[in-house]
A protein has these predicted regions:
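Hydrophobic alpha-helical segments and their helix-loop boundaries in membrane
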Residues: 1-209, 213-216
């Protein structure tokens, strides 16, 4: 019976096969809503990243055969973290569009002074904005947004393979999301803004008509 002999290259390949995808997934979880806030412990995020890595491992494909302690390995690690953080910011910007819409509605309604602490970012936000954020989070989970996120992660390893340089198209796509965020916020807030503006116009018009009568009495 022959003994099992493992070479250094094979061990390094096994380590890289799971470690580099985990860095990308952990970068995503550190920024995205729900998981990226301070209320979720770091150990929980790392454990969840390890679990998701095991689930997606069959779909990741081959990774470069690089020594984990080399400079090339450090560059690949930094690249994976950067990709994960960028993906997390894309998801975060979608939720920020909802927050921005809530702030616009609160200011229009005159409720901008009613503030509460946002546990996600640790800042004071209008209550209406926080309500919108909670509803967006519940809709995200109810509509299986977390399933779509797993599909996005799996697809990212095909579009942006581990170890390959980032193309200009991928970076430009992420940058274009800034404009999409503001347009999305306007689309979400527009019905409430139009309603409040109509109420304000009617109120001002009614006050303008009744004030002369009051002063003449």
């Amino acid at each position: 019976m022959s003994a099992l002999v493992l070479g250094a290259d094979q061990i390094n390949s096994w380590i890289a096969q799971g470690l580099w995808p985990m860095f990308r997934i952990a970068g995503l979880f550190s920024v995205m809503p729900v998981l990226g806030g301070g209320e979720v412990p770091v150990r929980a995020r790392v454990g969840l990243a390890a679990l998701v890595t095991l689930i997606l491992l069959p779909t990741i494909g081959d990774v470069p055969a690089v020594d984990p302690l080399s400079a090339t390995s450090l560059l690949i690690t930094a690249q994976q973290v950067l990709i994960g953080v960028a993906m997390g910011f894309v998801v975060l910007m979608v939720f920020n569009a909802v927050t921005l819409a809530g702030e616009s509605i609160a200011i229009t309604m005159g409720l901008g002074f009613a503030l509460m602490t946002d546990p996600q970012n640790g800042v004071q936000v209008p209550t209406v904005s926080q309500f919108y954020m909670i509803m967006a989070t519940l809709l995200f989970l109810a509509l299986n947004g977390h399933h779509a996120l797993l599909l996005l992660l799996s697809e990212s390893f095909r579009v942006l393979p581990i170890g390959e340089p980032l193309g200009a198209d991928a970076v430009w796509t992420l940058l274009k999301w800034a404009g999409i965020v503001f347009s999305g916020a306007i689309a979400i807030a527009l019905p409430a803004l139009v309603a409040m503006l109509s109420v304000n116009i009617v109120t001002v018009s009614y006050t303008h008509l009744t004030l002369p009568t009051i002063y003449s009495v």
